[in-house]
Protein backbone atom coordinates (compact mmCIF):
# COMPACT_ATOMS: atom_id res chain seq x y z
CA UNK A 1 0.00 0.00 0.00
CA UNK A 2 1.48 3.31 -1.09
CA UNK A 3 0.36 6.50 0.66
CA UNK A 4 0.51 9.46 -1.70
CA UNK A 5 -0.74 13.03 -1.91
CA UNK A 6 -2.14 12.25 -5.38
CA UNK A 7 -3.38 8.81 -6.41
CA UNK A 8 -3.47 7.84 -10.08
CA UNK A 9 -4.38 4.74 -12.03
CA UNK A 10 -1.17 2.92 -12.94
CA UNK A 11 -2.76 0.43 -15.39
CA UNK A 12 -6.07 -0.40 -17.10
CA UNK A 13 -7.23 -2.68 -14.28
CA UNK A 14 -6.82 -0.09 -11.50
CA UNK A 15 -10.04 1.18 -9.92
CA UNK A 16 -10.31 4.49 -8.06
CA UNK A 17 -12.75 4.16 -5.16
CA UNK A 18 -13.75 6.15 -2.09
CA UNK A 19 -13.75 4.30 1.22
CA UNK A 20 -14.63 6.09 4.48
CA UNK A 21 -13.82 9.43 2.86
CA UNK A 22 -10.38 8.27 1.66
CA UNK A 23 -9.63 7.94 -2.04
CA UNK A 24 -8.02 4.60 -2.84
CA UNK A 25 -6.80 2.66 -5.85
CA UNK A 26 -7.47 -1.08 -5.90
CA UNK A 27 -5.97 -3.39 -8.49
CA UNK A 28 -5.25 -7.11 -9.02
CA UNK A 29 -1.57 -6.06 -9.11
CA UNK A 30 -0.73 -5.56 -5.42
CA UNK A 31 2.03 -3.07 -6.27
CA UNK A 32 -0.62 -0.65 -7.58
CA UNK A 33 -2.55 -0.36 -4.29
CA UNK A 34 -2.58 3.25 -3.13
CA UNK A 35 -4.43 5.52 -0.75
CA UNK A 36 -4.49 9.24 -0.29
CA UNK A 37 -3.02 10.50 2.98
UniProtKB/Swiss-Prot annotation:
InterPro entries to which the protein is assigned, alphabetical: Ribosomal_bL36 (IPR000473), Ribosomal_bL36_sp (IPR035977)
Disulfide bridge partners, by residue number: none
Keyword vocabulary terms for this entry: Chloroplast, Plastid, Ribonucleoprotein, Ribosomal protein
One Gene Ontology cellular component: ribonucleoprotein complex
Keyword Protein transport set for record: no
Main localization of the protein described in the UniProt heading: plastid
PROSITE patterns in UniProt: RIBOSOMAL_L36 (PS00828)
Subcellular location: Plastid, Chloroplast
Domain of life: Eukaryota
GO molecular function: structural constituent of ribosome
One Gene Ontology term from the biological process aspect of the record: translation
Pfam families xrefs: Ribosomal_L36
Protein family membership: Belongs to the bacterial ribosomal protein bL36 family.
Name the record gives this protein: Large ribosomal subunit protein bL36c
Organism: Trieres chinensis (Marine centric diatom)
